Amino acid sequence: EENGFQMDLDEVRSKITPRTKAVVIVTPNNPTGGVLSERVLKELAEIAVANDLMVLSDEVYERLIYDGEKHVSIASLPGMKERTFTLNGMSKAYAMDGWRLGYVAAPEEYILAMNKFHQYNTTCAPNFVQLASAAALNEEGDEVNAMVREYKRRRDHAVKAINEIPGLSCQCPKGAFYIFINLSLIHISEPTRP
Protein backbone atom coordinates (compact mmCIF):
# COMPACT_ATOMS: atom_id res chain seq x y z
CA GLU A 1 0.00 0.00 0.00
CA GLU A 2 2.76 2.46 0.94
CA ASN A 3 4.32 2.14 -2.53
CA GLY A 4 1.10 2.78 -4.44
CA PHE A 5 0.61 -0.94 -5.00
CA GLN A 6 3.66 -1.21 -7.25
CA MET A 7 5.31 -4.63 -7.56
CA ASP A 8 8.28 -5.29 -5.30
CA LEU A 9 10.70 -6.39 -8.00
CA ASP A 10 13.30 -7.60 -5.52
CA GLU A 11 10.66 -9.96 -4.17
CA VAL A 12 9.79 -11.06 -7.72
CA ARG A 13 13.47 -11.83 -8.38
CA SER A 14 13.72 -13.79 -5.12
CA LYS A 15 10.79 -16.03 -6.14
CA ILE A 16 12.18 -17.01 -9.55
CA THR A 17 13.50 -20.57 -9.70
CA PRO A 18 14.50 -22.84 -12.60
CA ARG A 19 10.88 -24.06 -12.56
CA THR A 20 9.42 -20.56 -13.04
CA LYS A 21 7.87 -20.21 -16.48
CA ALA A 22 5.76 -17.05 -16.29
CA VAL A 23 4.77 -13.96 -14.35
CA VAL A 24 1.15 -12.78 -14.15
CA ILE A 25 0.38 -9.07 -13.88
CA VAL A 26 -2.89 -7.14 -13.71
CA THR A 27 -2.66 -3.43 -14.49
CA PRO A 28 -4.75 -1.51 -13.64
CA ASN A 29 -5.24 -3.88 -10.76
CA ASN A 30 -8.28 -5.54 -9.29
CA PRO A 31 -8.81 -5.07 -6.34
CA THR A 32 -6.30 -2.32 -5.46
CA GLY A 33 -6.78 0.09 -8.36
CA GLY A 34 -2.98 0.28 -8.64
CA VAL A 35 -1.41 1.03 -12.02
CA LEU A 36 2.07 -0.37 -12.62
CA SER A 37 4.44 2.43 -13.58
CA GLU A 38 6.43 2.39 -16.80
CA ARG A 39 9.61 2.13 -14.70
CA VAL A 40 8.33 -1.00 -12.93
CA LEU A 41 7.16 -2.53 -16.21
CA LYS A 42 10.52 -1.87 -17.89
CA GLU A 43 12.37 -3.50 -15.01
CA LEU A 44 9.94 -6.42 -15.00
CA ALA A 45 10.51 -6.80 -18.75
CA GLU A 46 14.26 -6.99 -18.13
CA ILE A 47 13.65 -9.68 -15.50
CA ALA A 48 11.43 -11.64 -17.91
CA VAL A 49 13.98 -11.48 -20.73
CA ALA A 50 16.92 -12.36 -18.47
CA ASN A 51 15.07 -15.38 -17.06
CA ASP A 52 13.32 -16.42 -20.29
CA LEU A 53 9.89 -15.96 -18.71
CA MET A 54 6.53 -15.46 -20.37
CA VAL A 55 4.27 -12.71 -19.03
CA LEU A 56 0.49 -12.97 -18.79
CA SER A 57 -0.71 -9.38 -18.71
CA ASP A 58 -4.37 -8.79 -17.80
CA GLU A 59 -5.14 -5.33 -19.18
CA VAL A 60 -8.95 -5.41 -19.08
CA TYR A 61 -9.04 -2.11 -17.13
CA GLU A 62 -6.61 -0.26 -19.45
CA ARG A 63 -9.13 2.46 -20.38
CA LEU A 64 -10.14 3.09 -16.76
CA ILE A 65 -7.23 5.31 -15.73
CA TYR A 66 -7.40 8.53 -13.70
CA ASP A 67 -5.41 11.62 -12.75
CA GLY A 68 -3.15 11.69 -15.79
CA GLU A 69 -1.86 8.15 -15.27
CA LYS A 70 -0.82 6.35 -18.43
CA HIS A 71 -1.43 2.71 -19.27
CA VAL A 72 1.65 1.02 -20.69
CA SER A 73 1.31 -2.48 -22.08
CA ILE A 74 4.34 -4.58 -21.19
CA ALA A 75 4.09 -6.14 -24.67
CA SER A 76 5.08 -2.76 -26.14
CA LEU A 77 8.48 -2.83 -24.42
CA PRO A 78 11.64 -4.15 -26.13
CA GLY A 79 11.89 -7.93 -26.16
CA MET A 80 8.39 -8.45 -24.78
CA LYS A 81 6.04 -8.85 -27.75
CA GLU A 82 7.30 -12.38 -28.33
CA ARG A 83 6.91 -13.38 -24.68
CA THR A 84 3.66 -11.70 -23.63
CA PHE A 85 0.06 -12.87 -23.56
CA THR A 86 -2.03 -9.69 -23.40
CA LEU A 87 -5.52 -10.43 -22.10
CA ASN A 88 -8.36 -7.99 -22.60
CA GLY A 89 -12.10 -7.89 -22.96
CA MET A 90 -15.19 -5.84 -23.49
CA SER A 91 -16.76 -6.03 -20.03
CA LYS A 92 -15.03 -3.20 -18.18
CA ALA A 93 -14.27 -0.30 -20.53
CA TYR A 94 -17.33 -0.89 -22.68
CA ALA A 95 -19.81 -1.91 -19.93
CA MET A 96 -20.52 -5.30 -21.49
CA ASP A 97 -20.42 -7.28 -18.25
CA GLY A 98 -21.81 -10.77 -18.59
CA TRP A 99 -21.46 -10.84 -22.37
CA ARG A 100 -18.31 -12.93 -22.02
CA LEU A 101 -16.23 -11.63 -24.89
CA GLY A 102 -12.52 -11.26 -24.46
CA TYR A 103 -9.45 -11.47 -26.59
CA VAL A 104 -5.79 -12.32 -26.33
CA ALA A 105 -2.74 -11.11 -28.23
CA ALA A 106 0.19 -13.51 -28.07
CA PRO A 107 2.92 -15.06 -30.20
CA GLU A 108 1.42 -16.89 -33.18
CA GLU A 109 2.40 -20.41 -32.12
CA TYR A 110 0.47 -19.98 -28.87
CA ILE A 111 -2.57 -18.54 -30.62
CA LEU A 112 -2.64 -21.56 -32.95
CA ALA A 113 -2.55 -23.89 -29.94
CA MET A 114 -5.30 -21.87 -28.23
CA ASN A 115 -7.46 -22.12 -31.34
CA LYS A 116 -7.21 -25.92 -31.26
CA PHE A 117 -8.61 -25.92 -27.73
CA HIS A 118 -11.11 -23.12 -28.28
CA GLN A 119 -12.76 -24.60 -31.37
CA TYR A 120 -13.90 -27.64 -29.40
CA ASN A 121 -14.70 -25.80 -26.19
CA THR A 122 -16.82 -22.87 -27.37
CA THR A 123 -19.34 -22.58 -30.18
CA CYS A 124 -19.13 -18.84 -30.71
CA ALA A 125 -19.99 -15.56 -29.13
CA PRO A 126 -23.56 -14.44 -29.91
CA ASN A 127 -23.87 -12.32 -33.03
CA PHE A 128 -25.10 -9.20 -31.18
CA VAL A 129 -22.11 -9.39 -28.81
CA GLN A 130 -19.68 -9.57 -31.73
CA LEU A 131 -21.36 -6.65 -33.50
CA ALA A 132 -21.51 -4.52 -30.34
CA SER A 133 -17.86 -5.26 -29.59
CA ALA A 134 -16.74 -4.35 -33.10
CA ALA A 135 -18.69 -1.10 -32.87
CA ALA A 136 -17.16 -0.31 -29.46
CA LEU A 137 -13.62 -0.89 -30.71
CA ASN A 138 -14.05 0.84 -34.08
CA GLU A 139 -16.23 3.76 -33.05
CA GLU A 140 -15.00 4.46 -29.54
CA GLY A 141 -15.90 7.98 -28.70
CA ASP A 142 -17.05 10.11 -25.86
CA GLU A 143 -18.99 7.30 -24.14
CA VAL A 144 -15.90 5.72 -22.57
CA ASN A 145 -14.48 9.11 -21.60
CA ALA A 146 -17.80 10.10 -20.00
CA MET A 147 -17.88 6.81 -18.09
CA VAL A 148 -14.31 7.37 -16.86
CA ARG A 149 -15.22 10.89 -15.69
CA GLU A 150 -18.21 9.49 -13.79
CA TYR A 151 -16.13 6.71 -12.21
CA LYS A 152 -13.57 9.32 -11.16
CA ARG A 153 -16.31 11.46 -9.57
CA ARG A 154 -17.63 8.45 -7.66
CA ARG A 155 -14.11 7.39 -6.68
CA ASP A 156 -13.27 10.83 -5.31
CA HIS A 157 -16.48 10.92 -3.27
CA ALA A 158 -16.02 7.39 -1.88
CA VAL A 159 -12.33 7.88 -1.01
CA LYS A 160 -13.12 11.11 0.83
CA ALA A 161 -15.99 9.50 2.76
CA ILE A 162 -13.96 6.40 3.69
CA ASN A 163 -10.97 8.43 4.85
CA GLU A 164 -13.27 10.46 7.14
CA ILE A 165 -14.32 7.32 9.04
CA PRO A 166 -12.16 6.78 12.14
CA GLY A 167 -10.08 3.61 11.81
CA LEU A 168 -10.50 3.31 8.05
CA SER A 169 -8.23 4.54 5.31
CA CYS A 170 -7.67 3.98 1.63
CA GLN A 171 -5.43 5.24 -1.10
CA CYS A 172 -6.96 6.94 -4.08
CA PRO A 173 -6.92 4.29 -6.83
CA LYS A 174 -5.20 5.25 -10.07
CA GLY A 175 -7.24 2.89 -12.22
CA ALA A 176 -10.08 0.36 -12.45
CA PHE A 177 -13.13 0.93 -10.25
CA TYR A 178 -12.19 -0.59 -6.92
CA ILE A 179 -11.21 0.90 -3.59
CA PHE A 180 -8.98 -1.21 -1.34
CA ILE A 181 -9.77 -0.25 2.26
CA ASN A 182 -7.10 -0.60 4.94
CA LEU A 183 -8.75 -2.10 8.03
CA SER A 184 -5.55 -2.66 10.03
CA LEU A 185 -6.49 -0.09 12.68
CA ILE A 186 -9.74 -1.85 13.47
CA HIS A 187 -9.18 -4.44 16.16
CA ILE A 188 -11.67 -7.21 15.70
CA SER A 189 -11.49 -9.93 18.29
CA GLU A 190 -11.88 -13.55 17.35
CA PRO A 191 -15.41 -14.80 17.91
CA THR A 192 -15.82 -16.95 20.96
CA ARG A 193 -17.07 -20.45 20.48
CA PRO A 194 -19.26 -22.29 22.96
Task: Mark where each language-model region is.
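Generic structural signal for small/hydrophobic residues in well-ordered secondary structure
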Residues: 23, 30, 58, 74, ...
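Active-site phosphate-binding strand-loop segment of PLP-dependent enzymes
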Residues: 2-67
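Residue-level detector of conserved catalytic or cofactor/ligand-binding positions
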Residues: 183-194
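Glycine/threonine-rich helix-loop capping motifs at alpha-helix boundaries
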Residues: 119-126, 168-169
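Conserved glycine-rich beta-strand-loop-beta hairpin in the small C-terminal domain of fold type I
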Residues: 134, 150-159, 170-183
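Active-site PLP attachment segment
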Residues: 77-113, 125-128
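Structural signature of PLP-dependent enzymes
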Residues: 114-118, 137-159
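A generic structural signal for well-ordered alpha-helical segments
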Residues: 48, 162-163
